[in-house]
């Protein structure tokens, strides 16, 4: 639990990990069933991040919580989520049970390739999977059209619908 000395402390008097734990305690004090975790581990060093993830997983199991876990940290997503929704510019690109499953959407593939690129052991796997330039979204087309290496004319003119690939895997792409 938290020591009572934390009651009179200000946020700037706590470490990053302590602030996260206090935030978690504040969120859980009303015994919710659903908790939004928006970048819950983004500003933490690796050791503290892992402790917070373990705490969140433990609390999820003990209190049977449901999390909406919003993050750019693909490793954290892999550890805590049992369903992943990948979005680009507010549009759903892919819904899948795990990032360990076969990835179908070009944007999800690019995200994973970029994450692998930060690991020196995986540098040979790092390939450019999207165009570098960031152009305005075509209002009638796919949000990822300008950056996708596989985009066709249909992608520019019509937004793709999210469709089943299998029971738990959905993708929004004209080419899949």
How does the language model describe each region?
Residues 1-6:
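Conserved "ABC signature" C-loop
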Residues 29-33:
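A short, proline-enriched helix->beta-strand linker immediately N-terminal to the Walker B motif
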Residues 10-14, 18:
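Conserved ABC ATPase signature
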Residues 95-176:
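Charged, flexible cofactor/metal-binding loops and thiol motifs
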Residues 44, 48-123:
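P-loop NTP-binding/switch modules centered on Walker-like glycine-rich loops
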Residues 10, 39-40:
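Walker B catalytic motif
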Residues 24, 36, 52:
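Hydrophobic anchor residue at the start of the ABC signature
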């Amino acid at each position: 639990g938290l020591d009572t000395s934390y009651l009179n402390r200000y946020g700037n008097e706590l470490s990053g990990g302590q602030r996260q734990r206090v935030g978690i305690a504040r969120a859980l004090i009303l015994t919710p069933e659903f908790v939004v975790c928006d970048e819950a581990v983004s500003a933490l060093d690796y050791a503290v991040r892992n402790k917070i993830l373990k705490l969140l997983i433990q609390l999820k199991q003990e209190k049977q919580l449901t999390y909406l876990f919003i993050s750019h940290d693909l490793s954290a997503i892999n550890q805590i989520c049992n369903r992943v929704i990948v979005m680009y510019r507010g549009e759903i690109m892919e819904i899948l049970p795990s990032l360990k499953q076969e990835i179908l959407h070009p944007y999800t593939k690019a995200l994973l390739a970029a994450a692998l690129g930060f690991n020196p052991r995986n540098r040979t796997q790092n390939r450019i999977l999207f165009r570098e330039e960031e152009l305005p979204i075509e209002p009638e087309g796919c949000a990822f059209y300008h950056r996708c290496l596989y985009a066709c004319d249909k992608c520019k003119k019509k937004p793709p619908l999210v469709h089943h690939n299998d029971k738990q895997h959905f993708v929004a792409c004209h080419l899949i």
